[in-house]
């Protein structure tokens, strides 16, 4: 116990406070340019959840580490995550991004154009993520980013791992669900699906995973 009287805090409370401070520092340490800021504003206007700047910066880093010539994304939104992914890709890399909402794809296309990214570097596909992923070629992608309905995470993980080249990386956003995924008392459908996705990754001997506490939780894994 630290302090006295009403100001006393337990070691667990102190640790939680430090963790919150570190999280806030990490999330607030990344700035975005005007193009990303505009895409983020449009994302908020249409109610599409965009990755935080800190998550975006990590996506850019992981994409660069993967080689970044072929990247697939499920959950385009208004293009915020796509811009970050493209920033880490090679000059001739191609981003395949999938969303069921045509309006989201239109706004993402606008964001990519504003960033000076030519149409040959992006492939925007309208459709259900599960349906589109099954049509993509085995072992053809350096990185797969999943930022879609948590209910579908297990299916996306199965398909995403299939798409990875050797040393490719799969990244799953919303792996924490605001802390619910780690709460033993939480047993709803979303939590169950997210835990199943994490289990599939953890039990795959070809994958080396890590859970990163940024945004709503990033579960990343590299394929051997």
Curated annotation (Swiss-Prot):
Its EC number is 2.1.1.-. GO terms for biological process: methylation. Keywords: Methyltransferase, S-adenosyl-L-methionine, Transferase. GO terms for molecular function: O-methyltransferase activity; S-adenosylmethionine-dependent methyltransferase activity. Substrate binds at residue 147. Disulfide bonds: none annotated. This is Putative O-methyltransferase ML1075. It comes from Mycobacterium leprae (strain TN). The lineage of its organism: Bacteria, Bacillati, Actinomycetota, Actinomycetes, Mycobacteriales.
